[in-house]
């Protein structure tokens, strides 16, 4: 919960800068994280509970519908709880008294908060996407992105009504625990338990059950409050009925105050109609408007007379105008008139004595825990947990709302409150015309939607939107589009380089002995097969894994290098060296096996510096750009330069997307990817926004 609290503070401080938006607190289940390819063991290393900083980082990005626009990646607070994630909210553990709230076990999850961008009226686009990037290492292969559309992220209603049973159960468990402590319980906890017991309709003085069976005829002790209550079950809470109605969801503190003020106004009008305001005489003393009951008490204290039945009925009639109390004489008040200043409805400060069961629960909790914490306080108030299912992984996540929260569903949520008006309008329009997609609507239907929601201009009217409109899988389709464009460019570049049967020469210099002539002949004979297997391996790479390769990172660096001077754009992660963009002689390679199945063997690109220009058919020497410490873990292939080992076929690229295919022995040919990579400027910009970040000149690293 602390991650949710921290994200609220961060959002409140940034609201004026980033525009209208809301925040949705979620708990992403361990099953959902695992299905997204995130190793749970990596999230548990260096847990804050063990005294070290968390070994992972979470970043958030908002992606607009159909336009390709994105907000910059920004860091968000997150915490991973390996077990009982929802249970931590519903039944928190007090370190000094771990048995205070028993709870059933449940799955773990990641606590994080996702922003929802909206307009000034709180209307959000259901097809917009919140992207969460979780990195447990510095390389691109040690990060995964989970996408949440606003439609699946924002539930239709909260579920505070389902939480009333839990609050009562927490009170009973506290009474039970205090009774079991007996004389060891703090006096304040005993007092709180006694009041809770009376409020819950149980014995006012709970006592622990005796260890020995009482003899026959002995009076039975009153039962321990909460002794028969089952543990608090997160799964029961998630599946129990109790969804709030839409009207209850929209109720806020401001609306409640408006209703109260309306009732007060009606009462004042009624009193004014019965007793019109009269001009105050010179002898009348200034007074403060008071309720009839308080006025009657003041009159009785001053006059000493007893009230009759008529007076008692008048007490309940309504409020009085200032200076016109029927129980107060028009003459100046004597010494007893100062009692008006002690009117409990106006000037008397509140008492520190708890006035409700919830406040007595607070008193007892603080006495047992030796203090209080914000997360404990929020757990003792109403909590809404809404079970949702993630489209990409088909696993569960939970949307959480707190009574004291300003995020979505919170009782203190600030305007504008999120509204599903756009989603409802799209559904109703499609149903009315019996079409599947909104862009299939008639021109009149589209015009009506555009009049109400101008944000639909690009999805409905743009002839070639960057992303497919009104498609929950639009981001997946866009990633596949970039992947396919890169594969086509690679295939076309290789075919162009090999047209006319060119002679593949030794571009990287290695010396061979006389006894290696037979080996060179065998390798030369296998060149066509090796190249064919290489293309199959590259084409068979899944889109998500493709963006971890040297080829994809070089493409992103090439696209991001168009940003100009001052600030440039680099791929996420630090797979590319900071000096990669400084020279055309800097290459990053992927190594593929030459025996058995052709597979990519390196987890991160291998950076190599060429001493000469390999594109001019001259021999060059190469070296690793960065020395790897001898103690650092690395794969066997990372110990060899391109072409140095017979076991690897190497594919490398520089900042200008000039590529080189290196066979064993240093034999190679060059390719020109940039000449065949066909991406329009809007598509290239959208790719850079999703897979890169801006850095200052001279700093090429980015986690």
UniProtKB/Swiss-Prot annotation:
Q: Which GO CC annotations does the UniProt entry carry?
A: host cell nucleus; viral capsid
Classify the source by domain of life.
Viruses
Where does it primarily localize? virion
Quote the Pfam families the UniProt record gives.
Herpes_UL17
Where are the residues of the annotated region Disordered?
200-246
Q: Signal peptide position in this chain?
A: none
Q: Which InterPro entries match?
A: UL17-like
Q: Does the keyword Transit peptide apply?
A: no
- Cell location: Virion; Host nucleus
Q: Which UniProt keywords apply?
A: Capsid protein, Host nucleus, Late protein, Viral genome packaging, Viral release from host cell, Virion
GO terms, biological process: chromosome organization
The Swiss-Prot or TrEMBL record describes its family as follows: Belongs to the herpesviridae CVC1 protein family.
UniProt function note: Capsid vertex-specific component that plays a role during viral DNA encapsidation, assuring correct genome cleavage and presumably stabilizing capsids that contain full-length viral genomes.
Cite the HAMAP family for this sequence.
Answer: HSV_CVC1
Q: How does it assemble?
A: Interacts (via C-terminus) with capsid vertex component 2/CVC2.
User: What is this protein's name?
Assistant: Capsid vertex component 1
Question: Which organism encodes this protein?
Answer: Human herpesvirus 1 (strain 17) (HHV-1)
